[in-house]
Amino acid sequence: MTESERRTVEELQKRLGVLFNDEELLFRALCHSSYANEQKQAGREDVESNEKLEFLGDAVLELFVCEILYRKYPEAEVGDLARVKSAVASEEVLARVSRRLELGKYLFLGKGEEKTGGRERDSILADAFEALLAALYLDQGYQKIKDLFEDEFESYIEKIMKGEILFDYKTALQEIVQREHKTPPEYVLVRTEKNGSEKLFVVEVRVNDETLAVGRGRTKKEAEKDAARKAYEKLVAEKT
């Protein structure tokens, strides 16, 4: 690490109240791929992106959230738990936690990402949080993650259970489809129907030209949401 990079890493440790045994691990968790690529082009072959840590962090997060759900809601149906798990592990919630930590200001971004507002982009913040979880897990152990974030995630889960945070089926579906098929779902308006005097829009949600579900609504947006909900519930049911 350069002196500037080391200072940033030290500042985040103070923010977290955690002293890492391996500061390089935390540094890597903060390195976006755009920064790692720029540094490699400049001859710094040892600078790695946070993508592998993000991969591990995704699994750590899933265990962390599932453990809370299992312990706090023993009577809940598996399908309901899966829905809440997807909501609390969504890009939107993880980005909120990252903003609370002010994680964006500690990230190492390439010049292009910096110019286009990468420090505030939900996807970058969510990915960085997962990478941070992995770094904490490897360096400090699972208990440290519980100490730092259990209360916060329990609060989000409770709000989702109560409907205070609305579940975004389109986002949840996109995350599943992107992860499994490496392509986003496509929403296609196939026709309109008459329901008495009311006009209904009919939308299909497709992945690789295969129809997952059909939704209906008084607006195209409402029909897309209905299709996303049906497709999401179908995919969750297939997994459980």
From Swiss-Prot:
Indicate the segments forming the DRBM domain, all copies. Answer: 168-237
Q: Which residues bind Mg(2+)?
A: 54, 127, 130
InterPro entries reported in the protein's UniProt record = dsRBD_dom, RNase_III, RNase_III_dom, RNase_III_sf
Catalytic activity as recorded in UniProt: Endonucleolytic cleavage to 5'-phosphomonoester
Listed EC numbers: 3.1.26.3
Biological processes annotated in GO: mRNA processing; regulation of gene expression; rRNA processing; tRNA processing
**Places the protein is found:** Cytoplasm
Q: Which UniProt keywords apply?
A: Cytoplasm, Endonuclease, Hydrolase, Magnesium, Metal-binding, mRNA processing, Nuclease, RNA-binding, rRNA processing, rRNA-binding, tRNA processing
GO cellular component terms attached to this protein's record = cytoplasm
Keyword Transmembrane on entry: no
Give the required cofactors.
Mg(2+)
Q: Which family does it belong to?
A: Belongs to the ribonuclease III family.
Functional summary from the UniProt entry: Digests double-stranded RNA. Involved in the processing of primary rRNA transcript to yield the immediate precursors to the large and small rRNAs (23S and 16S). Processes some mRNAs, and tRNAs when they are encoded in the rRNA operon. Processes pre-crRNA and tracrRNA of type II CRISPR loci if present in the organism.
Q: What is the name of this protein?
A: Ribonuclease 3
Name of the encoding gene:
rnc
